[in-house]
Amino acid sequence: MAIVGTIIKIIKAIIDIFAK
Protein backbone atom coordinates (compact mmCIF):
# COMPACT_ATOMS: atom_id res chain seq x y z
CA MET A 1 0.00 0.00 0.00
CA ALA A 2 3.06 2.24 -0.03
CA ILE A 3 2.44 2.90 -3.72
CA VAL A 4 -1.04 4.25 -2.97
CA GLY A 5 0.40 6.63 -0.38
CA THR A 6 2.92 7.90 -2.93
CA ILE A 7 0.18 8.47 -5.50
CA ILE A 8 -1.87 10.42 -2.96
CA LYS A 9 1.20 12.54 -2.16
CA ILE A 10 1.67 13.34 -5.85
CA ILE A 11 -2.01 14.17 -6.32
CA LYS A 12 -1.95 16.49 -3.29
CA ALA A 13 1.16 18.19 -4.68
CA ILE A 14 -0.57 18.71 -8.05
CA ILE A 15 -3.68 20.09 -6.34
CA ASP A 16 -1.47 22.45 -4.33
CA ILE A 17 0.09 23.75 -7.56
CA PHE A 18 -3.30 24.34 -9.19
CA ALA A 19 -4.59 25.95 -5.99
CA LYS A 20 -2.04 28.71 -6.48
Curated annotation (Swiss-Prot):
The modified positions for N-formylmethionine read 1
Keywords from the named record: Cytolysis, Formylation, Virulence
Recorded hits in InterPro entries, A to Z, give:
PSM_alpha
Biological-process GO terms, alphabetical:
killing of cells of another organism
Biological role: Peptide which can recruit, activate and subsequently lyse human neutrophils, thus eliminating the main cellular defense against infection. Stimulates the secretion of the chemotactic factor interleukin-8 (IL-8). The ensuing activation process triggers an inflammatory response in the host, thus contributing greatly to virulence. Also possesses hemolytic activity, which may contribute to the development of disease.
Q: Which family does it belong to?
A: Belongs to the phenol-soluble modulin alpha peptides family.
Instruction: Please share what else the UniProt entry notes about this protein.
Output: Peptide production is higher in most prevalent community-associated MRSA strains than in hospital-associated MRSA strains.
Q: What name has this protein been given in UniProt?
A: Phenol-soluble modulin alpha 4 peptide
Organism listed in the record? Staphylococcus aureus (strain MW2)
